[in-house]
C-alpha cells in the first residue's frame, strides 16, 4: 500500500510536496522562512484545511528560529502571525493552529531558546495529532459505508489535503483496506481540478477503484450507477452545521438530496467553528479570474470576459446527513449536537 505525506519537518526547514504540478511532476520544495510558507499557502503549493494549519504552525517555528535576542520578539512574531492569517481566509484550521501557537508565544517570559524549542514541539504535536485524528475519523466513518458501496466525492481530502491519510478520502481508504469492495466517482472539481489531478492520483497510488467525472455529471452518475453516499470535506463548519467547502459542493449536495443520496461532511473538530453562527458569516475567498479563463497554459475564454471565481461555497445544514469527526458522527439538529460535541470533550 502506497503512502505519502504532503508535509515533512526537517529541523530548520519545511518540506512540501508541490501540489500544483501533480500528477505530471512530483516536486518537493524546501521552505526556510515564514514568508515562503505564507506564499506557499496563498499559491496553493500546500492546500487542504488541515494541511494549511500544520504548515502555518511550522511557519511560526521558522520565524522564531531566525530571531535573536536583539530582536523585538513579540513584534516579529505578531508580524508573522498576521502574514499567515492573511494567506487564505476561509479554512478555519489555519486560524486554529495559529491560535495554538499564539497561546505559547504571547506573553512568554522564558528564554528565546526555550521558546524556539516549545514552539517547535507544539507544531510537531499538531502534525502528529492530524494523522491520529484522521485515522480515528476513518474508523468512525467506515460504518456508514456498505459493502460494495458506490461513493461520490468532491475535490481532494486525502493525504495531500492533510499530513497523511485524509478525511473523506481517509474513510474511503480505510473502507478499501478492510475489503469493502468500494468504487469511487471523483468530481474533477473545476477550476483547479483537485479531483482529477489529486484525488485520482491518490486513488491510483492506493489501488482504489475509481472513475473521474465532470462536475456536471453528478446527477446522471447518481441515477445511472445507484450511488450509495456522497463524502466531502470541509474548510469551515459553522455552529449551525452550514459547511464551507470547495466550490461545487453545494451543487453536489442539492443533486444528492434530489436523488436521496446521503451526503456526509468529514472533518476534524478543529474545522468546526462555534464562533461563526451560520454559513452567511463565513468569509469566502475569491481567486484569480485566470483560473477560469485558462486551463493550464491555454486560454479558453476571452480575456475581456468578467469572471466570478469563489474558491468555496456554503452547503446549508439541511442538505447534510451527518458530520463525521474523530469524536463520532454528529447528526441533526447540528446547532445543538455540535455544541454537545465540545461540551463532552
UniProtKB/Swiss-Prot annotation:
Known function: Catalyzes the interconversion of methylthioribose-1-phosphate (MTR-1-P) into methylthioribulose-1-phosphate (MTRu-1-P).
Catalysed conversion reaction: 5-(methylsulfanyl)-alpha-D-ribose 1-phosphate = 5-(methylsulfanyl)-D-ribulose 1-phosphate
Protein name: Methylthioribose-1-phosphate isomerase 2
Similarity comment: family membership: Belongs to the eIF-2B alpha/beta/delta subunits family. MtnA subfamily.
InterPro entries assigned to the protein according to its UniProt record, in alphabetical order: IF-2B-related, IF-M1Pi, IF_2B-like_C, Initiation_fac_2B_a/b/d, M1Pi_N, NagB/RpiA_transferase-like
Active site: 235 (proton donor)
GO molecular function ontology, one term from the record: S-methyl-5-thioribose-1-phosphate isomerase activity
Gene name per UniProt: mtnA2
Keywords: Amino-acid biosynthesis, Isomerase, Methionine biosynthesis
GO biological process, alphabetically ordered: L-methionine salvage from methylthioadenosine
Pfam families on file: IF-2B
Binding of substrate, residues: 47-49, 88, 194, 245-246
Enzyme Commission number(s): 5.3.1.23
Chain positions of site Transition state stabilizer: 155
Pathway this chain belongs to: Amino-acid biosynthesis; L-methionine biosynthesis via salvage pathway; L-methionine from S-methyl-5-thio-alpha-D-ribose 1-phosphate: step 1/6
Amino acid at each position: 500500500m502506497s503512502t505519502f505525506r504532503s508535509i515533512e519537518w526537517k529541523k530548520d526547514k519545511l518540506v512540501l510536496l508541490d501540489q500544483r504540478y501533480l500528477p505530471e511532476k512530483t516536486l518537493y520544495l524546501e521552505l526556510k522562512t515564514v514568508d515562503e510558507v505564507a506564499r506557499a499557502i496563498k499559491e496553493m503549493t500546500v492546500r487542504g484545511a488541515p494541511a494549511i494549519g500544520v504548515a502555518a504552525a511550522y511557519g511560526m517555528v521558522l520565524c522564531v528560529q531566525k530571531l535573536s535576542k536583539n530582536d523585538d520578539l513579540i513584534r516579529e512574531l505578531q508580524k508573522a502571525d498576521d502574514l499567515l492569517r492573511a494567506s487564505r481566509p476561509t479554512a478555519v484550521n489555519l486560524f486554529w493552529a495559529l491560535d495554538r501557537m499564539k497561546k505559547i508565544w504571547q506573553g512568554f517570559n522564558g528564554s528565546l531558546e526555550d521558546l524556539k524549542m516549545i514552539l517547535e514541539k507544539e507544531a510537531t504535536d499538531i502534525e502528529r495529532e492530524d494523522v491520529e485524528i484522521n485515522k480515528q475519523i476513518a474508523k468512525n466513518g467506515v460504518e456508514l459505508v456498505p459493502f460494495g458501496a458506490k461513493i461520490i466525492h468532491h475535490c481532494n481530502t486525502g493525504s495531500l489535503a492533510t499530513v497523511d491519510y485524509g478525511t473523506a478520502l481517509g474513510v474511503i481508504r480505510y473502507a478499501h483496506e478492510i475489503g469493502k469492495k468500494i468504487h469511487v466517482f471523483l468530481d474533477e472539481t473545476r477550476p483547479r481540478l483537485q479531483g482529477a489531478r489529486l484525488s485520482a492520483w491518490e486513488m491510483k497510488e492506493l489501488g482504489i477503484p475509481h472513475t473521474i467525472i465532470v462536475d456536471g455529471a453528478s446527477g446522471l452518475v447518481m441515477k445511472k450507477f445507484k450511488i450509495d453516499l456522497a463524502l466531502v470535506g470541509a474548510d469551515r463548519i459553522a455552529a449551525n452545521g452550514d459547511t464551507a467547502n470547495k466550490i461545487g459542493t453545494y451543487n453536489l449536495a442539492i443533486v444528492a438530496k434530489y436523488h436521496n443520496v446521503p451526503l456526509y461532511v468529514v472533518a476534524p473538530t478543529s474545522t468546526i467553528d462555534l464562533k461563526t453562527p451560520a454559513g452567511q458569516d463565513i468569509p469566502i475567498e475569491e481567486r484569480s479570474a485566470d483560473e477560469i479563463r485558462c486551463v493550464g497554459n491555454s486560454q479558453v475564454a476571452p480575456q475581456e470576459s468578467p469572471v466570478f471565481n469563489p474558491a468555496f461555497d456554503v452547503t446549508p445544514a439541511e442538505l447534510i446527513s451527518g458530520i463525521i469527526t474523530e469524536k463520532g458522527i454528529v447528526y441533526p439538529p447540528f446547532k445543538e449536537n455540535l455544541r454537545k460535541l465540545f461540551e463532552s470533550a
